Amino acid sequence: MDNAVDRHVFYISDGTAITAEVLGHAVMSQFPVTISSITLPFVENESRARAVKDQIDAIYHQTGVRPLVFYSIVLPEIRAIILQSEGFCQDIVQALVAPLQQEMKLDPTPIAHRTHGLNPNNLNKYDARIAAIDYTLAHDDGISLRNLDQAQVILLGVSRCGKTPTSLYLAMQFGIRTANYPFIADDMDNLVLPASLKPLQHKLFGLTIDPERLAAIREERRENSRYASLRQCRMEVAEVEALYRKNQIPWINSTNYSVEEIATKILDIMGLSRRMY
């Protein structure tokens, strides 16, 4: 067995496997182990299920350690094949459905692809999500200042502090129309809030970052440049943070947070409603 890997983990579903991945990853993060993840979506027929079973069994025979299998599968005949494998199998949805069934006195009606599939009941939500993504792409990095009033939040910050990935995550995960505006080196001699943003101050949210981390990120993009120098990064961060304080713009330091955590903090601080897709 590879000494760098403590356990092999399978995420298996008859749909996208997103649910299995998210819940399985949340569970595995509780343990101090290194894992090798294998995600297998759209296991919808017996032939594919047998191939998945063989893959699980092969790893068991190769390593001598049972793979961990997190699965979400509707059809019982497909589930039965997976359960015949040498893996330690956990039905992540059924573990929650069974007690809820008792509490609500209702029988579940499982349907494949219900969680992330399209149907007449969620088309409007899906269209709104795509519109949010289109808007966010069109308003990335100050590309366009038109229709800024349609943004639900406008992120500010120096170059490479995490504005773009956070904006896209907000749009894709929560359907939030997000614009972002960069403060560049040329702005620093007289840094003020642009006139186009002043009427929208209630929508502004600032990101900052530790100068040392910013310099390391920029160094990968433009090696040995003034843009990436620690001195330049310190100056830009100090100026932008002063701007936030002066204009009472809420802000967070993104250095030690993941994109998911940054986005969630923005939603919470700005009072934006989370939308589930």
Swiss-Prot record:
It comes from the Bacteria. The gene is ppsR. GO terms for molecular function: ADP binding; ATP binding; phosphotransferase activity, phosphate group as acceptor; protein serine/threonine kinase activity. This is Phosphoenolpyruvate synthase regulatory protein. The keyword Transcription regulation does not apply. ADP binds at G157, V158, S159, R160, C161, G162, K163, T164. It catalyses: [pyruvate, water dikinase] + ADP = [pyruvate, water dikinase]-phosphate + AMP + H(+); [pyruvate, water dikinase]-phosphate + phosphate + H(+) = [pyruvate, water dikinase] + diphosphate. Belongs to the pyruvate, phosphate/water dikinase regulatory protein family. PSRP subfamily.
